[in-house]
């Protein structure tokens, strides 16, 4: 059975997109060290990212913008991203396994698995792709807006991030539907 693993990164931050990734692994090309991206060092994630995009049978990465998150809400934006991931890889898999407890409204043979990123290697691989991709976006945001410190906090609502928003203002990349941002508008 060919499994498509899907996971997301970036539901909690105040800025940037939510990112979903899907991975179909090549059973003949074992990638050692796959685990939940949050349990890996940045260096290990980067190394595994390169191995995954090189050796996976198929993969895709989808971004949903802060503006779309504001229009839909974060749950619906995440489900939309996951749906788009599955559609991008349609007819290449037999079953979809998604990290978490919610599935998009779709007709695919699928299952939501709580802590799936720690249990299913395809979901672990998707977790790594989503996290590294999103972190790279945050590094680009840091280059564009160095005073905000995106390289450090990755958009999460840290004390430093909130103080920098108060000091320098709300950017287009901030999620205006999120309460901490609304309070600063």
Swiss-Prot record:
Can you state which reaction this protein catalyses?
Endonucleolytic cleavage to 5'-phosphomonoester
Q: Which UniProt keywords apply?
A: Cytoplasm, Endonuclease, Hydrolase, Manganese, Metal-binding, Nuclease
Where is it mainly found?
cytoplasm
* Cofactor: how and how many bound: Manganese or magnesium. Binds 1 divalent metal ion per monomer in the absence of substrate. May bind a second metal ion after substrate binding.
Which parts of the chain are coiled coil?
none
The answer to whether keyword Manganese applies is yes
Q: Which PROSITE patterns match?
A: RNASE_H_2
Compartments reported by the entry? Cytoplasm
Name of this chain's protein: Ribonuclease HII
Q: Which organism is it from?
A: Francisella tularensis subsp. novicida (strain U112)
